[in-house]
Swiss-Prot record:
Pathway: Amino-acid biosynthesis; L-threonine biosynthesis; L-threonine from L-aspartate: step 4/5. Catalyzes the ATP-dependent phosphorylation of L-homoserine to L-homoserine phosphate. This is Homoserine kinase. Belongs to the GHMP kinase family. Homoserine kinase subfamily.
Amino acid sequence: MKITVPATSANIGPGFDSVGVAVSKYLTIEVLEPADVWFIEHDLGDIPSDENNLLISTALQVKSDLQPHKLVMASDIPLARGLGSSSSVIVAGIELANQLADLKLSDDDKLDIATKIEGHPDNVAPAIFGNLVVASYVDEHVNSIVTEFPECAFVAFIPSYELKTSESRGVLPSDLSYKDAVAASSIANVAIAALFAGDLVKAGRAIQGDMFHERYRQKLVKEFVTIKELSGQYGAYATYLSGAGPTVMTLTPNDQAEALKTAIDGIGLDGETLILSVDKGGVVVD
């Protein structure tokens, strides 16, 4: 059995903690034979290979008496880069418990569990459903809507450095004025409505008008303004911080993606530029 979970790009500008899209980088978990103790074979650096791994600890939160197995974990989702690496592991852990214990969890069940573990649905929701997901988490209740993302390419600049979510949240204000909250929510409303309508031009303007988090976080990602200005020269719809950063994501027409990637590569930033697409399947079990 193999469990595959996509990477995710959250917030998409003003959709703070509530909007995310699944993209084409993947975590895979291969389930091998039963064992006396949990063991995860991986080449992902200094992460646990036993029940202290987030994958296993999540699965055991769902079902505490699971039969241990030998597993193989592989991932091309960069760690601590704003592409949902931890969320993908949480979703995989829930699916592992679901399969091994035959729990018959619905996708909504999985989302409820994942959101309680993660604290917000913006990454775990698209990792489960695929596509674009808008979700809320209020009073421990999750509400979500899934739709297809308008046709475009995602050009991701992934810096060589990590940025922990805790550090990125640390620069945010504790509150907004009523006036700013109204303005920020109106921008978010237009962004989501335009994405649902398939209008990337209007969506792009609203995405780049975010007032919730990017103005505070962009000082932590020195490449952000440079890439945003460069992308505008190539007809990009919008550039935004993916999740808590530091990945800088640009939405661009498909026929401009390669040219933009080449341009970003050409300015000598320390990182990797990738062209990604929307993953429409979410978590998959083979």
